[in-house]
Every structure is written in C-alpha cells, then in structure tokens.
C-alpha cells in the first residue's frame, strides 16, 4: 500500500478567525489538503512535516493526528495520515508544476472548495479537535543493556548499540512538535536517549530524579505532579522517562475510560504524545520507535 502523510494547515487571520490552507494541483486540476508520499526510511510525521513546507511554502508546528484516509490511486491502494499543523512563517514557494495556488480560507469555505469528500471529512475531524494545542511528549528511553548484563548501579546502565541508533533517529520524528524544553530522568539510559536530539535543537536538558524509576519508588505521585506542572504552565516539552512510569501518568491524566486503547507497555524509544489545552489533555497519539 502506498503510504502518504499530510496536514490541515491552519492559522489565525488578523481578525482572530481560523483559516486553513488548501492547494490547487494543476496535474489533477483539483483542490486538496497538502500531502505527499512517505519516502523510504521516513516516518509518517516527518513526511507530513516535509510535504507541508514543500506544497505550501510554510513552516509549521504539528499538533494531534486527526485521521486517516484510504483510497485507490490509479488502481493501487493509498493510505494518507493527517495531522493538525499550525503555520508559523512562509519560507518558500511550492513547485508551480505541482502546486500553482495556495489559498487561505475559513473552514466552511475551504470545505466547499475542496474537491474530495474525504478531505472535507478530515477538516471536520480537525474542527472536532480544535486549534491551539501544545504537546507534551512522554518518551520511553531507547533500548538499554539488559539488567542481567549490567553489574553496576541501574541508574548508570547505558544504551546498547540498537538504542544508540534509535537515539540518533529521534530528531526527525519530534522536530515537527517544536518542543521548547527537554526534561529527562537522571538515569544514564534516558540522558543518552535525548542527547543527540537536545544538542541538535540546542536545548539544555533538565534532569530530574522525579522522572526516574528509583524516584518513582519513593514517591509515586512525583512524575504525575511533574507532568501536570508542565501542562499547567503551557510548556511544549519532551519528557524522557521509563516504562512503568509513563503509562501510569497517562492513565491518571486522561482517565481509565479513554486510556483503554493505549493500555500497553511502551517498547524502547516509543512515546505517547499528550496534546494539551488549558491544563487538560484533549488528544493522545502513540508514536512508534524509529525505523532501524
């Protein structure tokens, strides 16, 4: 199946009203949401982030994943995953052979102009979530040495080779979220997980025992309080912690009823993204580990 990714790119007009971008493709003579194919080795969100810039000329900050569309293109099945994305600045122009017009319209007018009914449904899904969310990314550390293969203190247990490769490939997955802070457990395996990403983004990590396993054993409410504080202060953040901690924090924040669909352990380098507004979680996304 052909894999593709795109977004509902939105902004606020000078009046404060919401606008979304739709594009005209001369090849098909249609109006659509911006999207494009996932390249080999590329994650869906990385592809969506890249395609938005290429097809609209705008940089963006990604929010919740809002829906998936499956259809046939020239007889072959194609799956497109869509995110909400806030436009930040115009940094270029699309290739006119691929996109010759970009229009910013109110959602109702955009839906009227979109050619495909599936695109109109995606706009409706976006409106259900709403704009103006910020992410808190709860990232499990990458693959570490087994406890049975390590004689030292557990807090000093490092990443194994696969974990080091995973850590090097996190940046393209999480760059679209534009986190302003990186927080981490003080365990070495967590510190090593976020190191490349932090240096690439020029962010100084904030270390905390409240996010560690031994800290969790001392005070089981500490990680929840830590994440809730980030939510209350409206800080888009990456938080690197451990498997027994992250699911429990998410369960408390979203409630048992809504947690059922994600009630499983995270594999190394997987994450749950909490999309927040006004101190509350309005959507959650499960992020798979990087392809190795």
Where in this protein do the model-derived segments appear?
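Generic beta-sheet signal
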Residues: 135-137, 233-241
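Unchanged
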Residues: 38-64, 69-122
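N-terminal strand-loop-strand
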Residues: 1-33, 136-141
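A short, acidic, amphipathic alpha-helical segment used as a generic capping/interface helix at domain edges
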Residues: 219-235
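Conserved Nudix-box catalytic region and its N-terminal flanking loop in Nudix hydrolases
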Residues: 15-59, 150-158, 162
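Nudix hydrolase/Nudix homology domain
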Residues: 29-30, 92-146, 150-151, 155
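Active-site-proximal alpha-helix that buttresses catalytic centers in soluble enzyme cores
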Residues: 36, 47, 132-218, 224, ...
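Domain-level recognition of soluble alpha/beta enzyme cores
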Residues: 257-283
